[in-house]
Regions:
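Immediate flanking context of iron-sulfur cluster ligation sites
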Residues: 35-47
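Short connector loops at helix/strand junctions that flank enzyme active sites
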Residues: 20, 38-40, 60-62
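A short, polar/charged loop-to-alpha-helix boundary motif
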Residues: 11-24
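Short beta->alpha transition motifs characteristic of CBS
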Residues: 2-11, 87-89
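Ser/Thr-centric signal marking residues that sit
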Residues: 18, 46, 88
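Glycine/small-residue-rich phosphate/adenosyl-binding loop
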Residues: 5, 22-32
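Zinc-dependent deaminase
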Residues: 49-111
Length: 111
């Protein structure tokens, strides 16, 4: 019950397509815990993770992912193959309208 890492999308700032919030958090949390496995951790994100971030979550063995808004274009659930670790619990969408509004505002300011 402790926040050990937080971030936001840094793709524009770092000019790096892999600098999604999830990727930043996985690195920070792993450094904090001194472990590449995050099986006792939960990830809370505003938008459904993309395929890249979901794939990275597989390798971290993250315990739970909670997301706010669906991502009908790039979300990992649009793929026929489940890319999450079998022990990862997924919860979402939750507070979808609020989260969609936050995402739209964030990206309109960045792009």
């Amino acid at each position: 019950n402790k926040i050990i890492a937080r971030s936001h999308n840094l793709c524009e700032k770092l000019i790096d397509f892999t600098a999604h919030a999830e990727m930043q958090v996985f690195t920070s949390a792993s450094n904090y815990l001194q472990s590449k496995y995050l099986d006792k951790c939960s990830l809370y994100v505003t938008l459904e993770p993309c395929l890249m971030c979901a794939g990275a979550s597989y390798w971290t063995r993250i315990g739970k992912i909670v997301f706010g808004a669906n991502d009908p274009k790039k979300g990992f659930r649009n793929k026929s193959t489940n890319v999450l670790h079998p022990k990862t619990t997924i919860i979402g969408p939750i507070m979808e309208m609020e989260c969609s509004s936050i995402i739209k505002s964030f990206f309109s300011d960045k792009r």
